[in-house]
Curated annotation (Swiss-Prot):
Protein name, entry field: Erythronate-4-phosphate dehydrogenase
Keyword ATP-binding (UniProt): no
Annotated positions binding NAD(+): 146, 175, 232, 257
Gene expressing this chain: pdxB
The protein's Enzyme Commission number: 1.1.1.290
Length: 378
């Protein structure tokens, strides 16, 4: 059995070798000749999986180690009798922590407290729910917009997008990309929406590039609209609008979900799905794969305020480490993908062990996802 895996899927070689012969290949472009005798294909979001790629090939199963699936023609796979699995929620924690890193940086730079801001979350799935929970643990007001969930009657106080635009100081998008249909998200943030944002608002897109109309956004920024912008995703990736990058406050190369934990979850989820598909079901404990964190332990004295939280968050991950490299190489062919391929190891907050002498600080840090314990001062 021959299994092709994306060369940038951590632990893929070791795991899938339990099931067959493994060949690691680049995801963009994928070497088509390798598909001629392969039984399974494991990809990431950079690989377009459709009829033109797989027609006439012996592939029986496709797995994507990503939460999103807009790069996969699921309907054609089903029609062709090819098994499929994604990894929903695998990088949700990573994306939430990317948003926090960005907001805490902007808050420090511009001198505001997040408690004074209302955060509008568009898309309340794996990412949106976790973001809401962490923000509310800090006492920060959130407004939720998710029409599909609202129409299904899911639990939640869902508002219209217009209401979020009117009342939110921070608007962050966490939706799939739907190009048509009743829940279309293509250019959900169009010129009208962008112009309607509150003066000084923060706009964040860490889902799919085309959810925000990049041309319209650049037009508004060029005209002097008072707006802070965080973009991790771009229309036309791996190409991006260099002029737009120059205007945004934070710009990164589609790496919001790129923690080691998130990548490992994606790999293990599709591994487990494929093992079940071929009748050799196996399960993997994530902590048996991950290395020891870079940080040992730190001690925190007193309560948890915003500056302290910012220091802890940026000790684990400071978004500026990914903004600067993109600006240096933007517009150079191949460099966007190279940044992603050679991405520095990044961990999640849970990798940081924090000893607190304040019980409320320890409790709050645990709610936020840190590995915190309370040890009273002697």
């Amino acid at each position: 059995m021959k299994i092709l895996v994306d060369e940038n899927m951590p632990y893929a070689r070791d795991l899938f070798s339990r099931l067959g012969e493994v060949t690691a290949v680049p995801g963009r472009p994928i070497p088509v000749a390798q598909l001629a005798d392969a039984d399974a294909l494991m990809v990431r979001s950079v690989t377009k999986v459709n009829e033109s790629l797989l027609a006439g090939k012996p592939i029986k199963f496709v797995g994507t180690a990503t939460a999103g699936t807009d790069h996969v023609d699921e309907a054609w796979l089903k029609q062709a009798g090819i098994g499929f699995s994604a990894a929903p929620g695998c990088n949700a924690i990573a994306v939430v922590e990317y948003v926090f890193s960005s907001l805490l940086m902007l808050a420090e730079r511009d001198g505001f407290s997040l408690h004074e801001r209302t955060v509008g979350i568009v898309g309340v799935g794996n990412v949106g729910r976790r973001l809401q929970a962490r923000l509310e643990a800090l006492g920060i007001k959130t407004l939720l917009c998710d029409p599909p969930r609202a129409d299904r009657g899911d639990e939640g106080d869902f508002r219209s997008l217009d209401e979020l635009v009117q009342h939110a100081d921070i608007l962050t998008f966490h939706t799939p990309l739907f190009k048509d249909g009743p829940y279309k998200t293509l250019h959900l943030a169009d010129e009208k929406l962008i112009r309607s944002l509150k003066p000084g608002a923060i706009l964040i897109n860490a889902c799919r590039g085309a959810v925000v109309d990049n041309t319209a956004l650049l037009t508004c920024l060029n005209e002097g609209q008072k707006l802070s912008v965080v973009l991790d995703v771009w229309e036309g990736e791996p190409e991006l609008n260099v002029e737009l990058l120059k205007k945004v406050d934070i710009g990164t190369p589609h790496i919001a979900g790129y923690t080691l934990e998130g990548k490992a979850r994606g790999t293990t989820q599709v591994f487990e799905a494929y093992s079940k598909f071929i009748g050799h079901e196996q399960h993997v404990a994530l902590d048996t794969l991950l290395p020891a964190p870079e940080f040992g332990r730190i001690t925190l004295h007193g309560p948890l305020d915003q500056p302290t939280l910012k220091r802890l968050v940026h000790l684990v991950y400071d978004v500026r480490r990914d903004d600067a490299p993109l600006r240096k190489v933007a517009g150079i062919p191949g460099e966007f993908d190279k940044l992603r391929k050679n991405y520095l190891e990044r961990r999640e907050w849970s990798s940081l062990y924090v000893i607190c002498d304040d019980a409320s600080a320890a409790s709050l840090l645990c709610k936020l996802g840190f590995n915190a314990v309370h040890h009273p001062a002697r």
